[in-house]
């Protein structure tokens, strides 16, 4: 068994496996920006693009594409996630996917080494039957992807943050708050908005949203009906919202953040690290994170047409544990060109009818099994896992056949083939059987892994 590791961010542990040979692509860091790129075998005009090698990380790619070339490439928000690995190969949602789609949708060309040691240059013109599987079929599954070429996009003019919280003073007012927010949701289910709304057992909603190509004044006008409703119920809610807007060109510019919003980032001060390396402070909690429970689900757009019913579902689920609703990790409401590109990938088609994605997780940091003083409390872990299971069972029961994002899913998902890939799975399995019949590449809940015993 051969396992591929890029940066090792996989939530399902697909970048490692027992009794296997591990290939680590960390030092393959070449990045090349193209003004006009024509995929191999193509006879059409070129498009702006970037080629990234297997060990490239998104911060390095954004530096080349945005800071130095004035373009945007659809990638991940966490700066240390790999740009040529499981993120793209597993579809790849980011904060701006309602505008730009998934990372896989931007793939123009892939260089892949198959199990029989054959080097293939895959595009929509050459080996087109590999095009879909590499665009969303999962990392470390069909071969070793040594480099990818991704379409780049015109840079948005502005980037904004919409951050705050609303606390309801009773269960009744919290249920009504959820309903009112879901009533309002269509106003932000579009290509301008992304990121999260968090619901908690403490009757609190946290808003951590981003927006693009809107001014602060436009955002204020969009949300004013919701603010007016809150103001009409001063005895029921305490709330505070901050709106900020910055030039999009500075999204990945460490000097801009250090000068203007230093509390939002963490500069990498370790000796010998590349200049300009940083991560978002909100990602601190992911360092050495030990998961007790991790479950997720797409929420069909049709459910948003009945806000009262969906509010009851969300309220009941929030009694067990907090969860986040991601605006940008679903494609109903996304820009048409982004949707058109993603329909050519092998992502579960149910995503096109989903208006949001929900994640419920319970975890701790600084937990290390086998190290005295840092061992997990098993009883505590099981109690939190049970809370996550109980809360997500309510959401799953309300969303049969909704499907899920394969990169961020329950490790124990029982019907993973259908949940992750829907009716695309037979095609994926056929490609797997053709290029890797002996299952040289096999990871947890990857295409064909059910045949590995």
Question: PLM features: residue spans?
Answer:
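Soluble FAD-dependent oxygen oxidases
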Residues: 1-453
């Amino acid at each position: 068994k051969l396992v591929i590791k890029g940066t090792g961010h996989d939530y399902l542990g697909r970048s490692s496996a027992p009794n296997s040979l591990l290939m680590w692509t960390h030092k393959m860091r070449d990045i090349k920006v193209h003004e006009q790129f024509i995929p191999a075998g193509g006879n059409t005009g070129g498009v702006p693009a970037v080629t990234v090698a297997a060990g490239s990380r998104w911060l390095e790619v954004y530096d080349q594409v945005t800071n130095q070339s004035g373009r945007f490439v659809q990638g991940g928000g966490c700066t240390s996630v790999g740009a040529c690995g499981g993120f793209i190969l597993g579809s790849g949602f980011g904060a701006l996917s309602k505008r730009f789609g998934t990372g896989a949708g931007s793939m123009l060309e892939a260089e892949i080494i198959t199990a029989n040691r054959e080097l293939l240059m895959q595009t929509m013109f050459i080996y087109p039957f590999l095009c879909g599987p590499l665009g969303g079929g999962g990392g470390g599954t069909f071969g070793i992807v040594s480099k990818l070429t991704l379409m780049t996009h015109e840079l948005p003019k502005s980037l904004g943050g919409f951050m705050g919280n609303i606390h309801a003073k009773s269960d009744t007012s919290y249920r009504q708050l959820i309903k009112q927010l879901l009533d309002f949701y269509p106003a932000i289910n579009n290509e301008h908005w992304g990121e999260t709304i968090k619901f908690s057992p403490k009757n609190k909603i946290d808003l951590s949203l981003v927006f693009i190509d809107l001014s602060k004044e436009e955002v204020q006008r969009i949300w004013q009906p919701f603010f007016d409703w809150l103001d009409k119920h001063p005895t029921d809610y305490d709330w505070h919202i901050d709106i900020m807007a910055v030039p999009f060109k500075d999204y990945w510019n460490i000097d801009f953040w250090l000068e203007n919003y230093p509390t939002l980032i963490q500069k990498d001060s370790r000796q010998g690290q590349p200049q300009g390396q940083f991560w978002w402070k909100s990602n601190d909690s992911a360092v050495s994170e030990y998961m007790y429970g991790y479950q997720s689900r797409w929420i069909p757009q049709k459910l948003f047409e009945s806000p009262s019913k969906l509010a009851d579902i969300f309220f009941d689920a929030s009694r067990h544990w907090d969860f986040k609703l991601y605006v940008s990790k679903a494609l109903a409401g996304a820009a048409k060109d982004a949707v058109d590109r993603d329909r050519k990938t092998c992502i579960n088609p149910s995503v096109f009818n989903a208006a949001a994605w929900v994640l419920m997780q319970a975890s701790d940091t600084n937990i290390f099994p086998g190290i005295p003083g840092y061992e997990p409390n098993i009883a505590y872990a099981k109690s939190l896992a049970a809370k996550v299971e109980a809360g997500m069972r309510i959401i799953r029961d309300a969303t049969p056949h909704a499907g899920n994002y394969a990169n961020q899913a329950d490790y124990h998902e029982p019907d993973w083939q259908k949940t992750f890939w829907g009716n695309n799975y037979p095609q994926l399995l056929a490609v797997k059987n053709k290029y890797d019949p002996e299952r040289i590449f096999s990871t947890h809940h990857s295409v064909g892994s059910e045949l590995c015993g």
